[in-house]
Amino acid sequence: MSAATETEVREFQTEVSQLLDLMIHALYSNKEIFLRELISNASDANDKLRFAGLSDDSLFEGDSELTIKLEFDKEAGTFSIMDNGIGMSRDEVISNIGTIAKSGTKEFFKSLTGDQQRDAHLIGQFGVGFYSSFIVADKVTLETRKAGAGAEQGVRWISAGDGSYTLENMEKAERGTRITLHMREDEKEFLDAWRLRSIVRKFSDHVTWPVKMLEELPPAPPAKEGEEPEPPKTPEWETVNKASALWTLSKNDITEDEYKEFYKHVGHDFEDPMEWVHARMEGRMEYTLLLYIPGRAPFDLWDRDRRGGLKLFVRRVFIMDTSEELLPRYLRFVRGVIDSADLPLNVSREILQQNRQVEAIKKGLVHKVLGMLEEMLKNDPEKYATFWKEFGMVLKEGMIEDFANKERIAKLCRFSTTHDGERVPKIALADYVERMKEGQEAIYYVTGESFEACSSSPHLEIFRKKGIEVLLLSDRVDEWTVTHLTEFDGKPLQAITKGELDLSKFAGGEEEAKDEEAEKAQEEALKPITERMAKVLEGQVKEVRLSHRLTESPACLVGDAHDMSATLERLLKEAGQEVPTAKRILEINPSHALLKRLADEADEEKFGELTHVLHDQALLAEGGQLKDPSQFVKRLNKLLMG
């Protein structure tokens, strides 16, 4: 490298500067987490070296005892943490520390609210890691060398967290990373052995690598008269944490607080988990699992490139962060550890995707997670309601992805319905089936782009009048869910916006079932109107017919029984897919005053204007978009002015 590039001053990426500013303010009340974050990073560096060393033991450079060391200097006002892990090259320092090279960054900043407590949670989820140093330090120096690189390839990084950093080459004999924090004047409390030890034991007791500090020696006794004073003893490094893999211990030997703190380490979260399951699986496959459900949904839950939430170990050796290989996507919110006794140490992602043993583990993990949710639902419905609020929309994807567990997942799902009219989904499909009217053969549902669009749909009118419950499905995933969950408990799911509808066998209020002959007579009498309307709307609709589902609205649009729903059509088009626009059926309410006006309208131009407005209103009522809104407004104004 040329001398000109040996030392350089670089600007932080804009997002890093924003994050530093946000973090210092939002996390100040929880500032001791800086040590947990730095220990967690050091632990990851050791994990990576241990894994890389399986295939190239020269990377250990003759020292395979991996540790994390802490030291402080009260006089200098500094705290340092050292690991002898994988280390970083100059380019890696720039990409890992000078920029935020992770997906979901924009979504993260959009999700910040200004509420310190909520933002602290989000910042914690984002993974502040190294940047947490600036909560307590006004200057940070990082010195690192990549394992296997020459001593002259060391790198020094220095910043005061003010928008820029200095990068320079250095000689570094030992591989790994040393981070030195120049503590702020009001943060000198952390330059204390007892304080540091207590934080390590609180947050990092079960980090798998020994966290060491120099032992504290009592002052040497004064020399007796005429005797030489004793030479000062050299303090030894002593391990502060238990350095045991928590998941390998018996459940009876682990406290609730230890489970919670381990989650914060492995899940990179600041908050307690909602629930967890810890089990040792034996038989054909032997593995241990410790799985957690977070307290809140992460901001990047919908990001397909997000980091895996599971850490895979083989006989306590960390292999990789993974997710999809061991859990289906609909359980991507799960965090935790899997430790296999049977997988090879050199396992790769490709092997994971093709390995039968991995399939067996995956099946076992799904069984455990669904079992944990079933237990939560049974024993703590309030907690399950919180789970559903945070992760329900993702769990619904399981009915699409996991055919084997479709029924089991369906029983865990909660829905909004016309029964209580509440936005918060509380109703189970089993509850719906139990309340079905005598003679009701289908589970009825309506889909829409919002709860309001569903609950105010004109298609619901006859169902409300007859007291028949309807599921209100407004989550984006619902359109795909109902194409896969076609029945529940032997009852088919039926969209109320498609196909012919005959609810005449159900009386509603004082209404008696209509005589079939009377209905035919009414259809015949109104045939001239439906034919005139169909002519006006030629090319826009399949047909115009009398409705059996409207009681208040003048018209609605419906599809044939096997047509794609209007909502799904819109979603696919928004996703950039070419979807042929299906012509809908316009159903009109023969009892509505507007239909009587249409019947009396002799002026064909006015009849046409009224028909178009009626059609456009029906389209708007179901959440659709008009091709020509200005034309609709002109027609409406014209009719209003008589």
UniProtKB/Swiss-Prot annotation:
An annotated GO cellular component of this protein is: cytoplasm
* Residue ranges, annotated region (C): 571-642
Instruction: Quote the protein name from its UniProt record.
Output: Chaperone protein HtpG
Where is this protein localized, as stated in its record?
Cytoplasm
Describe its function: Molecular chaperone. Has ATPase activity.
Instruction: Name the segments for region: B.
Output: 350-570
Per the UniProt entry, the signal peptide is none
GO MF, one term, reads: ATP hydrolysis activity
Return the CDD domains for the record.
HATPase_Hsp90-like
The protein's UniProt keywords, in alphabetical order, are: ATP-binding, Chaperone, Cytoplasm, Nucleotide-binding, Stress response
Any Pfam family the entry gives? HATPase_c_3
